[in-house]
Amino acid sequence: MLSVVEGIFIFVVISESVFGVLGNGFIGLVNCIDCAKNKLSTIGFILTGLAISRIFLIWVIITDGFIQIFSPDIYASGNLIEYISYIWVIGNQSSMWFATSLSIFYFLKIANFSNYIFLWLKSRTNMVLPFMMAFLLISSLLNFAHIVKILNDHKMKNDTVWHLNMYKSEYFIKQILLNLGVIFFFTLSLITCVLLIISLWRHNRQMQSNVTGLRDSNTEAHVKAMKVLISFIILFILYFIGMALEISRFTVPENKLLLMFGMTTTAIYPWGHSFILILGNSKLKQASLRVLQQLKCCEKRKKSQSHI
């Protein structure tokens, strides 16, 4: 029987999951419509992949968490935890792959540096970005092969209880190794964000020396992109904290509250960033406003029909 606090956490997690599926589903739907019209751009492809991978990631988070809460004995026998681990790695890595590609895209499109290499990359963004995405994908696949080896080696050492018989130090070391790809993507995103902030600061300093003091459209683009990237960093830090809490829960399996708090913190990232992307992207924002207007019109029609 769940306590009141645990029930609240379950409600919050389910609400976050619903919002996450709706937000990411909306992003994917808008870009799929553009794809059907042969209007899908590079940013549209990245956003579509990011939305799909995050929906997948949300379902993995919920499935894994609910199994640990309501049926923890399932993980003590059989190969379910192995399959969940593989699915988790695929969803996590693919989500971070697209998120890092999005960060690089904003950096190349908006940042402004006088460095020759950067200018060369910036002038060839549409050509360079696919190569960078391919490089990130290859590194992700290589890391996945390493993860498979870790999981197989660990399974051979633990025939009866797959996860819980491990020493704490060994367990945490293996978790770090399993998340090396995510750490790499996060570091790369952080670097692009910092460089973009530096570019924005320099541009604002130049604008302040101007007599008018007005911000041009380029500065507005810098600010919008910086908000998106900074929000991504903040949400992803929360995502890391949530994962750490869920991982720590295996050392104290009787503490369900710690797991629920970890799930709540982890689920903030895939749904929160999707709504920030909708508000930060003019096409997605306009599409969302049209949907809201249509919903309001439908509500008014229902009210008028009920009065007749």
Curated annotation (Swiss-Prot):
Annotated localization: Membrane
Gene Ontology MF terms: bitter taste receptor activity; G protein-coupled receptor activity
Highest taxon of the lineage: Eukaryota
Signal peptide: none
Glycosylated residue positions: N92, N158
Keywords: G-protein coupled receptor, Glycoprotein, Membrane, Receptor, Sensory transduction, Taste, Transducer, Transmembrane, Transmembrane helix
Cytoplasmic side: 28-42, 122-126, 201-227, 279-308
Pfam families from the UniProt entry: TAS2R (PF05296)
Residues on Extracellular side: 1-6, 64-100, 148-179, 249-257
Transmembrane region(s): 7-27, 43-63, 101-121, 127-147, 180-200, 228-248, 258-278
One Gene Ontology term, aspect cellular component: plasma membrane
Topology term for the membrane: Multi-pass membrane protein
InterPro entries: TAS2R (IPR007960)
Note: Most taste cells may be activated by a limited number of bitter compounds; individual taste cells can discriminate among bitter stimuli.
Function text: Receptor that may play a role in the perception of bitterness and is gustducin-linked. May play a role in sensing the chemical composition of the gastrointestinal content. The activity of this receptor may stimulate alpha gustducin, mediate PLC-beta-2 activation and lead to the gating of TRPM5.
Protein family according to the UniProt entry: Belongs to the G-protein coupled receptor T2R family.
UniProt-recorded name of the protein: Taste receptor type 2 member 10
Organism name: Pongo pygmaeus
